A protein has these predicted regions:
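Acidic, polar-rich N-terminal leader regions of halophilic archaeal proteins
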Residues: 2-106
Length: 106
């Protein structure tokens, strides 16, 4: 392994550690845990996933209609309106913005 390769790998590990320790990543992990521990959010996620799965099967079979699509969209909107999900989605967006900025800098 050349010195340059070792240095690049070391820099990559350091970058990974810095990202993992960033406020954005920590906030995302906390928000994710809050969603995982919220019974209402988990139930709504299950319901949304079931509706989405059924819609995808119907779409593949040519049976999907606008009403079933609206039903999926409404379930998603209700899920996203939960305060715990709003915090999760905000934290996810902030982390993604940070990662995009890091990627552009590289």
């Amino acid at each position: 392994m050349s010195v340059d390769t070792a240095t690049l790998e070391d820099l990559g590990r350091e970058l990974g550690e810095q990202i993992a320790n960033s406020p954005e990543h920590k906030a995302f992990l906390e928000a994710n845990e809050a969603v995982e521990n919220d019974a209402e959010a988990q139930e709504m996620i299950r319901e949304f996933e079931q509706l989405r799965h059924e819609f995808m099967l119907d779409r593949e079979a040519g049976r999907a209609d606008r009403e079933s699509m609206r039903e999926v969209q409404n379930a998603q909107q209700e899920l996203h309106n939960l305060p715990v999900m709003e915090k999760y989605l905000d934290a996810q967006e902030e982390l993604q913005d940070r990662l995009t900025a890091v990627n552009e800098a590289i």
